[in-house]
Amino acid sequence: MRAVSQTSPNRLAEALSSPHMLKEMLDLFGHEYLPVFEGEIKPHGPLGTSDSRAKRPLNAFMAFRTYYLKLFPDTQQKNASGFLTQLWGGDPHRNKWALIAKVYSFLRDQLGKGPVNLSAFLGIACPLMNMVEPSIYIEVLGWEQTAPQGIVTFQQNTDIMKANLARLFNVHPTTEIDLLTSILSAGYFTDFSQVLLMRMWACQNGIMTTTSATAGNNVATTQPLYESVPTTAEKVSFINAVRESRNLAAHDLFGPEYDAAFFGNRFVHSWEVQDLTSFQNVQISVADSPMESNTLYNFRMPSQCLPQVSEFDLYDVIDTSIIDISSAWSIDQYLHEKQSKMQQQCKYFLFRNSDCS
């Protein structure tokens, strides 16, 4: 520290303009060095936007989803989201994605959402973290696309994945400040590099990741990612009640009219699994639109009010959406949408024919 204090201001400023040099200085003399800049290193100081409150941290899956969405350029958004959820279930680098998401959240809170575009940030951070490029992701991770009965799914061969990942170069930053330093050293946010590094160092909330090719979810943190939820006797009692009988628990919570038959008639399905990564290739029926429940469905509706569609084609539904065929309202909704689409097509062809004539 004495040597630093005796260094000329110009020489010191030149040295500290290097993010790597500044990080080394902070690691050595941070506790003595930072108080000089106390007014600048507050977590949400002059760099912040007009709304200086910290926003919700970016979810690791959302970072993954944004980076690999380009895998399905010609796929409908809802289908692409389903595919990416399945790929996420077999991704071995969730700890690295958590690290990337934390650094993005930090920069967004410091500089504002405008200057820190997520897609642009991932284009910088992911190569620095040696994430698998989208163009080779499916092949490297051992995924194979199948389409039984027209339903596209992915199957993963973990042996192929491990062999492929073992051949890849896997040196990467292992803490938040390491990744931030690498980003700043690459020439991004240079006008704010010093104060950004000092603020992150002062926060002391870095995530440690392992360098294993298949590190999985192993994330060691200097402090918890999320604050723990306090446990109360009431919570413990209710959780135990749900474990013993979820129907009785709902009955006690909502009232006597909410019994097993009530929930059963509403086509609300649930699955209990030990690990979400093993919950794959399951078609989950979505909830009905907010309207009268199926138990109140009017089965005596006049025939002229029903959709005039000749038949219900199951294979038409596969690429459209997932519906519950035990729900009368869901069937009618699908048939009505099909009828409307057919009418629009007829109008279009009539319009074209009239122009041709």
Swiss-Prot record:
It is found in: Nucleus. Residues 53-108 bind DNA. It comes from the Eukaryota. GO terms for biological process: positive regulation of mating-type specific transcription, DNA-templated. This is Mating-type protein MAT-1. Belongs to the MATALPHA1 family. It comes from Fusarium oxysporum. It holds the Pfam family MATalpha_HMGbox. PROSITE patterns: ALPHA_BOX (PS51325). The lineage of its organism: Eukaryota, Fungi, Dikarya, Ascomycota, Pezizomycotina. One of its GO terms (molecular function) is DNA binding, bending. Keywords: DNA-binding, Nucleus, Transcription, Transcription regulation. Mating type proteins are sequence specific DNA-binding proteins that act as master switches in fungal differentiation by controlling gene expression in a cell type-specific fashion. Transcriptional activator that induces the transcription of alpha-specific genes. GO terms for cellular component: nucleus.
